[in-house]
Amino acid sequence: MKDQITHLPDNADRSVAKQKFKITNWPTYNKALINRGSITFWLDDEAIQAWYESATLSSRGRPQRYSDLAITTVLVIKRVFRLTLRAAQGFIDSIFSLMNVPLRCPDYSCVSRRAKSVNVSFKTPTRGEIAHLVIDSTGLKVFGEGEWKVKKHGQERRRIWRKLHLAVDSKTHEIICADLSLNNVTDSEAFPGLIRQTHRKIRAASADGAYDTRLCHDELRRKKISALIPPRKGAGYWPGEYADRNRAVANQRMTGSNARWKWTTDYNRRSIAETAMYRVKQLFGGSLTLRDYDGQVAEAMALVRALNKMTKAGMPESVRIA
């Protein structure tokens, strides 16, 4: 954080020239980009060795043939290569054949059914304190026309969306928490369940003005996290226990906007959450294909798992040059 407000430049509220950066780890990052297209990067030894479910004598009912990891792997490959379930089945079977591995891909109907109950793990083995967690949400389309058709001919059929909520470590770009909700669930309503997914110590959390509610601030206070949420225009003071918010309100009243407060608190690091949303749309598209809501949750978490795997493989490190 910046220690003194006097360091704020006079033109902080005005737009500035676009900064230029140079990637300092290009060879490593370039190799990571190439590896994203390798099938063995996604269908690795861990998945192959745990492809079939281990038999357990204590369980009741018909045992599952394929493990949760196998179903998760199929969903991840489906998202990464943008395949249908049937195409993913044929694709994976052909890979097993070329690798001379005595395995079979789960039938597409099996994947569709198991997706409703599978637990897709997307968390990385990273541990320790998180200095700054940034939070945002975006919409993923389930049903409806494309943007171009709507622009040219208007909206003809109902459009259905789901909201993907992400909490991202601003230092590592890893997605720490993720959730999928119906479109009518507000960001602030989804926030408590999202932040409770991690038990790691968090110093500060940034979110936009949509999260400026008692519900969100109470959850951050409960977890002893510093709240970096800009108050809405004309916001009033809350009771004394909401010290973080009251300081932001005082700054807003003193300066007439939240600009100075954002600069002095490093709130603008929240743009990393927007970067994560951009990566989701660019790498995997902005839609979900499974029809059942529980299946859509699994599909979204598979997408998050894939993005974390890409992040762990290598991210660009840059320095400002202009």
Residue ranges and their predicted role:
Residues M1-R60, R65, T73, L103, ...:
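Charged, often Cys/His-bearing segments associated with DNA-binding zinc-finger transcription factors
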Residues M1-T6, R113-V118, V185-A190, A250-G256:
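Short, motif-level signal for alpha-helix interfacial/capping segments enriched in acidic residues
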Residues H7, R14-K18, G209-Q282, L290:
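Helix-centered, glycine/charged polyanion-binding patches within enzymatic domains
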Residues K31-I34, S38-S54, A248, S257-A273, ...:
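Acidic, contiguous segments within the catalytic cores of piggyBac-derived transposases
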Residues T56-T72, V76, V80-R86, G90, ...:
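Polybasic low-complexity intrinsically disordered regions
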Residues M99-P102, K309:
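Short arginine-rich
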